[in-house]
Amino acid sequence: MQAEIICTGSELLLGYVQNTNADYLGHELAALGIEVVLQITVGDDWKIMEQAVREALERVDLVITTGGLGPTTDDITKDVIAAVLGVPMVTDDESLAQMREYFARRGIEMPDIFIRQASFPYGSRIIPNHKGTAPGALIERDGKVIVIFPGPPRELRAMFETWVKPYLLEIPGRGEVLRTRVLKLTGIAEYAVQEILKELGDLVNPSLGYLAMPGEVHLRVNAHAVDPAEAERMVEELTEKVTGLVGEYVFAIDDEVPEKTVGDLLLRKGLTVSVAESCTAGMVAARFTDVPGSSRYFIGGVVAYDNDLKREVLGVPAEILDRYGAVSEQTAVAMAEGIRRLTGSDLGLAITGIAGPDGGTRAKPVGLVYVALASARETLCQRLLLPGVRKAVRIGTVNSSLRIVKSFLNRQA
């Protein structure tokens, strides 16, 4: 089964709004075994939109539109589809009543302009919208299916999961399903990951996809099969081989939030942590405290850019700074032990490095970072050489720091 996605809205064409709906729908449809052959974006132009819908219905079995369901005159998606199908627009009384109730719950009388949101092409099956005011619709016509979604991603996703996905699962002949696992790596460049994984040979199905982002590389493991269980097995098998080669760089899998994973481990083990940061300037502390309830295990942090602060607050000996410099294993270790001593936390995490673009030398290049972790029993330190510009180095340092803490906690009894 093939599908086409038509995203509407001049704000998308002008770049004012990021089109996350197409990404979401493409991924979800592929997982159902539905091939998306084309995704286009059109503005609020009747003639262009009408042409796009007509051509899509000639090409594919499933046409999905997003956006253009609002109450204003430039919201024309349903009217265009009605014209293409040659059917009138009709008001759905139940949708209208639900919309009036939506406004009533907020103590507002529904403006008349919203009435048009309850009008649909004749023959539509209404898709309720419990997250907003604009319902969607599903139309079956001559062996084709048209699904009409509102534009806000929060509304679209809820409607897809609740109503459209179950409908699509009942359609026979959807083809092979796609199963995916995303490994998120840090501390290594995209080309270096590809070089390491060359020994796996030429992969077709399952396959690997690469996406470089600031401070991390997303490695996508994909597999297609008619049987979902077989696709899962193929993904698991290749994932195991991949992690055997680059597992030391993996800091998260799929939608895992590493700071939450680390926080859960700290809570489970009854431990606390504090942070001393130089080149990341509070970014690690911010990630820890992005998690609600992190005060149960995160004590606090110190941003110590200046060497005087490293000495006076963290207790880094002057002789260490003079002999080895601020960016060194010795300084990182002293910072980690110092923040642990200062705050009374069980673990002390410290970061010092050269984020660039200036400050690097042949001996200490831009991207050189030391991450130290101190506990009552030992102090560990890792030397990192991170690729990219300043932003990438700092994000990579944060991700690597969380990976180091996670690895340490997983080794503890």
Swiss-Prot record:
It comes from the Bacteria. It holds the Pfam family CinA. CDD domains: cinA. InterPro entries: CinA, CinA-like_C, CinA_C, CinA_KH, Competence-induced_CinA, MoaB/Mog-like_dom_sf, MoaB/Mog_dom. PANTHER family: NICOTINAMIDE-NUCLEOTIDE AMIDOHYDROLASE PNCC (PTHR13939), NMN AMIDOHYDROLASE-LIKE PROTEIN YFAY (PTHR13939:SF0). HAMAP family: CinA_B (MF_00226_B). Belongs to the CinA family. This is Putative competence-damage inducible protein. It comes from Desulforudis audaxviator (strain MP104C). The gene is cinA.
